[in-house]
């Protein structure tokens, strides 16, 4: 495997340091064994998320100085609008403070209580907004996506038979829309093939069902299509992205990922009537339709960053840096979700902590142990993130119980990946010492963000 060098020069740095293990243990206890509640100053390598943790380019920082902070009609909005229209092909764009704001708008605009939203695996905040507006989420991802050890391409594809069955049983009129994530975060960052997007479009169009993409990591998805799908090897990333969105009615976007910024998002659509309603609604929750809760400078940085993300040298390095970490862990026998996705390496906590049951929260405990032993912050993605069933109150029990090692864009080097891998490999050698956890505080909504735990 050829791992390309960083396609950039580092112009500005932030000093970090490793605090002693006994201090890390104390900090973890104070945080209730929840890595979200740690203070960033106490973290050596922060792999909690790739959301908003990117390093911006010199051109983006220059653009920040050109912020038009008019309350209405900011020139930076029009730059962002033109950029998104050109690269994605959608007719309308509504800016939001981040992806969650776009999810909120779409859910209110598209869902009637009692309807269904089908998608290729749930995501935490997305499903929350869907359920909050009265929908029932139905997972129609291919079964292989739930098998951590199965190494096949495009595990994020929608199962067309499942989709057809849902249409037959519930009726097309009762399906609000299809939520197609590119890539599928909780499956390990797995991509969706262009063939599957095209087939989903054909099936839904025949039944009058809308398709909205979660476009957060669309550039990473495009890279996998170029790398692995026949007929796309000679197409540019921008060409692939444009074709991807030609099979959708709109999308939600968190700019904090593939737009290479620290804040921002947007909602896209082609429907004029929906756009008119969205402009009315965004004023209530975000701000004027020409800023959506963002400063002009942030919209400018987002427009520049989205275009930079289309550069092949950037996205090749980004994906292969993640793959480098995964390959090193796999070579040492550490169980990971395969194949390695575009934004993170997911440890398979079921196999890593096979002595713990799912009710002992193995992924949560593993994430806490990784911080204590290595100074690296990661994130639980298992039963805690899945939450509870709104009707029964029982835990959702995902087949995948993982810890996500999420790589920020243009922030860390291969040397950092070596440190992460070496620490986790060492921890794996005494994995039996990892103990189960229990709740001592469980929030009612999106509990993984602020819950607290203690050892059983």
From Swiss-Prot:
The keyword Zinc does not apply. Its EC number is 4.1.99.2. Coiled coil: none annotated. Keywords: Lyase, Pyridoxal phosphate. It catalyses: L-tyrosine + H2O = phenol + pyruvate + NH4(+). InterPro entries: ArAA_b-elim_lyase/Thr_aldolase, Beta-eliminating_lyase, PyrdxlP-dep_Trfase, PyrdxlP-dep_Trfase_major, PyrdxlP-dep_Trfase_small, Tryptophanase_CS, Tyr_phenol_ly. It comes from the Bacteria. Its cofactor is pyridoxal 5'-phosphate. Homotetramer. This is Tyrosine phenol-lyase. It comes from Citrobacter freundii. The lineage of its organism: Bacteria, Pseudomonadati, Pseudomonadota, Gammaproteobacteria, Enterobacterales. The gene is tpl.
């Amino acid at each position: 495997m050829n791992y390309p060098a960083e396609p950039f020069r580092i112009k500005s740095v932030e000093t970090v340091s490793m605090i002693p293990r006994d201090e890390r243990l104390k900090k973890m206890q104070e945080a209730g064994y929840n890595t979200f509640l740690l203070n960033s100053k106490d973290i050596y390598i922060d792999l909690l998320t790739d959301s908003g943790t990117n390093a911006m380019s010199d051109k983006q920082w220059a653009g920040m100085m050109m912020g038009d902070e008019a309350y209405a009609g900011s020139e930076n909005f029009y730059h962002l609008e033109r950029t998104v229209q050109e690269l994605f092909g959608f007719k309308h764009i509504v800016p939001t403070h981040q992806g969650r704001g776009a999810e909120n708008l779409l859910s209110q605009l598209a869902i009637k209580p009692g309807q269904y939203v089908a998608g290729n695996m749930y995501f935490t905040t997305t499903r929350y907004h869907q359920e909050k507006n009265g929908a029932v989420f139905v997972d129609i991802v291919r079964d292989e996506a739930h098998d951590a050890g199965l190494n096949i391409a495009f595990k994020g594809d929608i199962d067309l038979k499942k989709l057809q069955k849902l249409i037959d049983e519930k009726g097309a009129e009762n399906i609000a829309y299809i939520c197609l994530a590119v890539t599928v975060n909780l499956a390990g960052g797995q991509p969706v093939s262009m063939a599957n997007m095209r087939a989903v479009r054909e099936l839904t169009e025949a039944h009058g069902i809308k398709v909205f993409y979660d476009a957060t990591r669309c550039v990473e998805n495009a890279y996998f299509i170029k790398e692995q799908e026949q007929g796309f090897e000679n197409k540019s990333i921008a060409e692939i992205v444009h074709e991807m969105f030609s099979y959708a009615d709109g999308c939600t976007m968190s700019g904090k990922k593939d737009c290479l910024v620290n804040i921002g998002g947007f909602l896209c659509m082609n429907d004029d009537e929906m756009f008119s309603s969205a402009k009315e609604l965004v004023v209530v929750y975000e701000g004027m339709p020409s800023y959506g809760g963002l400063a002009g400078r942030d919209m400018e940085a987002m427009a520049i960053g989205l275009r930079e993300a289309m550069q092949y040298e950037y996205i090749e390095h980004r994906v292969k840096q993640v793959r480098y970490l995964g390959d090193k862990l796999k070579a040492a026998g550490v169980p990971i979700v395969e194949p390695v996705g575009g934004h993170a390496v997911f440890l398979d906590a079921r196999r890593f902590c096979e002595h713990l049951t799912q009710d002992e929260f193995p992924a949560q405990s593993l994430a806490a142990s990784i911080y204590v032993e290595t100074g690296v912050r990661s994130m639980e993605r298992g039963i805690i993130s899945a939450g509870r069933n709104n009707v029964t109150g029982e835990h959702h029990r995902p087949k995948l119980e993982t810890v996500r090692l999420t790589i920020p864009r243009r922030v860390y080097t291969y040397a950092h990946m070596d440190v992460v891998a070496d620490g986790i490999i060492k921890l794996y050698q005494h994995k039996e010492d990892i103990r189960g956890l229990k709740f001592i505080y469980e929030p009612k909504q999106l509990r993984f963000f602020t819950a607290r735990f203690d050892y059983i």
